[in-house]
């Protein structure tokens, strides 16, 4: 099996989940999966590829077991000659492999620019996606190859292509922290207003992945700083929640610049509107009334026009102009200015002039009695309105503070409860799952805190808006008595019969002022109505939000109670289990002591039997020596009587030998029985020691057990040494018997030569047969001892393996204990 890797350059990303898709470029190739043309394409042998195509033209688009063509493999390995050959033979350019990647995607993935250019020139589609939703442009962004990206865009690659996470190449470059690619894509007019699945803008992602350079680039592009994601958070909130002070300062400075520009634009539009209004009023009135007009415009117009309405900073200019000029034309659509003006401030001033003339015409035929009644009603209602407004404001402020306090206290309660759960509930999850769970809970808590702070800020801003609106209402109501007093003066002047020309001029000025004030009051009333409607809608929305927050708080309290009950139950259950384990530990310790005592007894018995066996062996060796001496004496003496005595002595020696062999067999039987007992006890000891190991792992008492295992290991080594000594003794005895057999064979040869000593020959033959039997018995014993030695070696090997396992388990327990203490 051969493995080939292509394009080993790797990029550094901010997310670990991206790496497994974009790094490790190239195919994992096995010879068994390839045909001849595929092997030639991998090697870059263009001549071999031509030969394969000449033999079989159908192999041009042949697929291997991974659905790859020769073009895929040639592009991945960067063999330009093979790619040009296959493309000129008109192979399929947009074939997909198992990962739905085309040869173009694979060439860009492996950063083989020459192959990618050839494919693009021959009509490869750059907008096809793989199983991850990535186009060739996404891979070019990841490898930070601007030349490849430029060629893809010049051949019709879609600059706003989306992957599975709805990331455009620009957003993907921001996620991977590729500043060069961000600048390049923005130069190529990539949309900076694109958002991902969570409606996060490019600026939010740059803040989230802590890349101040990209933030600076985006702010220079005049990106929308006030854009919000699904949770209602903007880029500044992301910087605050991730403690990125530098990026937060950048965003704040940019916001200040925007606000300064808007204020300057609003001020200029206000001044132009006031000047246009003043000129229009001067043109419509006679020359004698200029002074009164200047006074009226100073008192009324600048205060109402220049004061900005509450709202977000990027909507202030529009609201100021529209608020002053939208009200009256809605009621009187037939009234239109004679000239169309492009500036919105000028339009507002023209509309205001038309409204004032209309109000002046309507106000002339009004009866004096109705005006007096209105004046009295307004004087009665004014203190009540002030008190009602103040009470409403105080109630709303208290309500918003209560909401923020309840949400913050609920979040803090949830934080402390989750921390308690993390401390007192450690054994429910494994370590890794617990760490991931703690990280997720901390992130959720931080997000909830930021959301609560944002809600609190929004509520404060809205309350400040409402205060400004109520102040406007009070100012409007304060202007009403002045208007009514002016009307009363004009009526009294009309009722007096002796009024002169000067009084007529004063009355004219008062009437003009009255018309202006009425128009202002009408505009203010309309604004107040719209504001009241907006306030009612917002109040309803806030009431709904309060209900939702209360429901969530109730659900969280229930969840906390359930968690507390579960924790108490689990703690009680684990306490019971711990007590049971302690009792079992004591019981196992007692059993282990008993087993140790029985083991000592068995060892003492074995030692006694070994001493007996040694004595029997020594007796046997002495009998062999006596037999040898007797045989030598038999050779020397040829006397019949001596031979008879020797034969009797030999028979006695044989009887003794038989008796000793019987004793030896009995001792061996006992020895085998003791060995069986020892094995059984050893097996039981092993089982109980394993059980004790599991208990002591839970109670961190494995060190004592390691010492016991060391002692057992030393005892087993001593036994092995004893068995090896026995084996050496047996081998020596076998050699000795073989020598005796050789000597007896020589004697037999000598005796056969002598015809007179037939009886001696028969006796010697019998002795030879018996010695052969003894040799056979001793060989069987030696085989048994060898088997026992092998068995003991296997047991030693098992003990060593168990010892290593115990050491590993001890280390793991220590590591888990230290990690738990740290947590």
UniProtKB/Swiss-Prot annotation:
Domain of life: Eukaryota
Pfam family, one: Ank
UniProt keyword list: ANK repeat, Coiled coil, Repeat
Basic and acidic residues bias (residue ranges): 371-384
ANK repeat residue numbers: 66-95, 99-128, 132-161, 165-194, 198-227
Ranges where the record places region Disordered: 301-343, 356-405
Coiled-coil stretches: 431-480, 565-724, 776-806
UniProt KW Repeat keyword: yes
PANTHER family the record matches: ANKYRIN REPEAT DOMAIN 36-RELATED, ANKYRIN REPEAT DOMAIN-CONTAINING PROTEIN 20A1-RELATED
Protein name per the record: Putative ankyrin repeat domain-containing protein 20A4
Protein's organism: Homo sapiens (Human)
Taxonomic lineage from the root: Eukaryota, Metazoa, Chordata, Craniata, Vertebrata
